Amino acid sequence: RNNLGGQAFWSLGGLFLVDTPEQRRLGIRDSHDLALQDWMGTAGFDRDEDHWPREWAKAYVAFAAGEKRGWLQAMGHRLFPVVGWAERGGYDAMGHGNSVPRFHITWGTGPGVVEPFERRAREHAKTGRITFKFRHRVDALDMTGGAITGVSGKLLESSSESRGESSSRTETGDFAFKAQAV
């Protein structure tokens, strides 16, 4: 209950965005094509089994260059007017890393990233669209016909520890949930 948002809460709040007003204001020239070239150069997809990771990368870069910023803004997310250069790469966009700054820092850092999502999730919980299952440790994913159709694991005893404090790992039972898709 006290840790909704997980590790994102503790983060600096940096988000990968492409060709934004913040970048343009700082004179950073970016584009979908450049970001995709950087991503593909870093990932080094070169095997048959890289097909779906490659497709995911293409979709994510398209999202980051398109609707991601507006979608986040519509939920109340705000950015600092600076852009950092995490995972800095070469300037030629041919190797590992970002060839231009793309690390947009959230106003409020990690808690600022979590807040709009937490608010939205809690609203859905009030209407029954989401059911939170705190203190459930997932140990296995169940597959049927190549799709994940369930999760199972251990129930942990209740804990009222504050965020960042160690909580009990004492197991009190088992659980399993099934669905058409998880």
Segments and roles (model prediction):
Residues 12-61, 75, 80-81:
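Glycine-rich active-site loop/strand segments that organize a redox cofactor
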Residues 8-9, 18, 22-29, 86, ...:
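General "foldedness" signal
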Residues 10-12, 17, 21, 112, ...:
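A broad "ordered helical/assembly scaffold" signature
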Residues 13, 178-182:
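Conserved acidic residues
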Residues 57-165, 169-175, 179:
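Conserved redox-cofactor binding core of oxidoreductases
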Residues 2, 15, 22-23, 139, ...:
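Short, glycine-/Ser/Thr-/acidic-enriched flexible segments
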Residues 1-12:
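Glycine-rich FAD pyrophosphate-binding loop
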